[in-house]
Amino acid sequence: QFGLDVKDCGNLSGPANPWQDAVNGFRHLPEVVQWNQLLHEAMYAELQAGRLPIMLGGDHCLGIGSISAVARHCREKGKKLRVLWFDAHADFNTATLTPSGNIHGMPVACLCGHGPKELIEIGGHSADRPALHPKEIRQIGIRSVDEGEKRLVHDMGIEVFDMRFIDEMGMRHAMELALALVDAN
């Protein structure tokens, strides 16, 4: 009807959540790494095949695998990248900033090179050459950020359109600013 060729690639299968306490500041790191590696490979394969992959469901930490695949693809094709991160939270925590060790509060930090090596390096990225640079991300709808996390987001220079901005200026204006300078490349 819309001229789209939709392909359901099914579900990924990975390790179960072991429900354990944090180890060295990270909860379930081996399992999170496995899931993100699986997702990265699946997303990257679809991008290489010329398709636009859409992932439905999952924990916020899976943004590491999906976005690192898009970042890798864009880098290889010489394309610019802009990530719109719609969330109430900045997800820019690190093991030193949060006592919980929950990696679902860390994906943006990991994508920007601040996190465990195993997650930063998915897709061939590194702390020196992260999947994302702060100028490539816009955070939209943020309303609840830990104090240390807030300082780190500010220090990194990430552009944030928090709920106060949206309430005062409107979502349309926030999106116009977030998408400014986006072109066909």
What is the predicted function of each stretch?
Residues 1-185:
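Conserved alpha-helical scaffold segments that buttress catalytic/binding sites
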